[in-house]
Amino acid sequence: MGKTSSKNKINNLLVDLESTLNYKIEKDGTIKTKIFELANSNDESTSTKYVKVSIFDKEKRGTILHDKKTISRLLETPSKCTKQESKSIGSMLGMVIGDAMGHRFEFQNLVYDTITLKNMGKGKGGEFQLEPGQWTDDTSMGLCLADSLLVNKGEFDPRDLMLRFLLWWNCGYNNAFRFDKEIKSSCGLGGNISKSFRAYVNEKGKNPYTKAGDNKTSGNGSVMRNAAVPICFHNDIKKGREIAKKQSLVTHQGDEAAACCELLTFIIIKLINGSELKEVLDKLGEEFKCDVESVNTLAKSEQENDDIDRNWNWKDKNFKYSENRAKRNPGYIGSYCMDCMAMALHVCYVTDAFDKAIIKVVNLRGDSDSVGSVVGQIAGAYYGLENIPKDWIKVVEKWDNQEIALRGYMLFHLFDDIKSRVNDL
């Protein structure tokens, strides 16, 4: 996607989709809509390349400004949140914290029982040399999903979502560098998602659900970004599962990937509504059912068959990743959605605090940012905002202007009064 020809195709695609998505493409390449407003840059060579604003910018946003003030108060004094608000905000923040901390060890070889990172870190680090609190594709795509649901008032629009993904990768929308003095490109694009982008562009946006790969294409790229769905649909578990599956199919044809998104949504909706984590996980096998038998087996925490690489017994206190997959790709272990979900459930099952869960999972290395993101979503939805270390949240706030938490708050309240909550987006 980095080649000029690909970028030209994307520019042409944006023009083709103009009427569908109400976008106006200016001659200089900027995108003018009530959703995106490109900030002017002193450097004219980059002013049209990077989207440096969010859907919450600009002054006259009515209740949006009220919500920004509200979220500041809630972050300062979490006890003012309702339990459900706290869990919803906690899940969104958990996604970014797990991602940001996990990036420090991403692509490093898997290790067990070695704890060397106990906080957000200091100085630049990780594959992409990010500052503490800066995030990768996991969170950026999760924010694209959140924005799409907010702007479309809870209706799922796969074309809108894919366009936001393209804007992230090609224009920097929702990346971690909006308040960074350095001009940086978006980072972390996975192989399966990259193929889905290319397919979408080559087809000129005819099919919003990817034709790249096949029904076995089940990386963790759709699971890692799923946080917004259970928050938005916390009162409708059937609808939440449906949207989780659909958002997965935008970039992954894989049956297991879609079913893992359903499973994650099921768990988090239960937690937001007050269920105990241990109870949810202990009853998961009997209460969760889907069309993919391997994911049903994972929910039961069982061995799938005689193949040692299909062991999903995450309740075992000594549970480990597939030994063969870990040997083949020790720096990428966890990138398969089943490995990702199994390890995330294991970590949440054997720990008793948000910080303990995050510290345990990111220190495993491998695909630590994505598995960390999933752990953060679950742990945040259970322990809530008040139990996330404040200093960790402060590190993230340097780069997000409290808008990740704001999205969690607004998604939770989206169906309370759509007109007042999402007016003028």
Regions found by a protein language model. Give the residues of each.
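Structured, active/binding-site neighborhoods that engage oxygen-rich ligands
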Residues: 2-425
